[in-house]
Amino acid sequence: MLYGRIFFNSGVQLLSMADKKFSLIALVSFTALAIIVLYHNISPYLTPSDLIAQGKAENVQVVGKIVSVNGNTFQLSDGKNTITAVYNGTVQRYDAEVVVVGNWDGKVLHATKVLQKCHTEYKGG
């Protein structure tokens, strides 16, 4: 029986050389595209020291401690280095561990999200 370009002969599938090449090219292209998309969506946690060493970066996640707040600007530290971050929202409190998501222009972190880490700890009893 004939179904498109694939022939069935006693349950055995026969593909032409052109079909095999097309299938291989399609598979390799899809795999490469998936790897590229995953690579660009993965955003590892950085410290302020890592960020300073890296230079400009987009869509970064920076973990650190808020050491001071002044309006919509705050200072984020990892104990070694401190960076300035700007956020158009409310920072709940300083002296808190946070993850800041945003874009780094080399001098200021322009935050799109500020996520406070949970400060409570499980204590088994």
From Swiss-Prot:
InterPro entries, per database record = CcmE (IPR004329), CcmE-like_sf (IPR036127), NA-bd_OB-fold (IPR012340)
Query: Which stretches are transmembrane?
Result: 21-43
User: Where located?
Assistant: Membrane
User: What highest taxon heads this organism's lineage?
Assistant: Archaea
Q: Which UniProt keywords apply?
A: Membrane, Transmembrane, Transmembrane helix
Which Pfam family would be a valid example here?
CcmE
Gene Ontology molecular function:
heme binding
Q: Its Gene Ontology biological processes?
A: cytochrome complex assembly
GO-annotated cellular components: plasma membrane
| Membrane topology term | Single-pass membrane protein
Q: What is this protein identified as?
A: Uncharacterized protein AF_2191
Species, as recorded: Archaeoglobus fulgidus (strain ATCC 49558 / DSM 4304 / JCM 9628 / NBRC 100126 / VC-16)
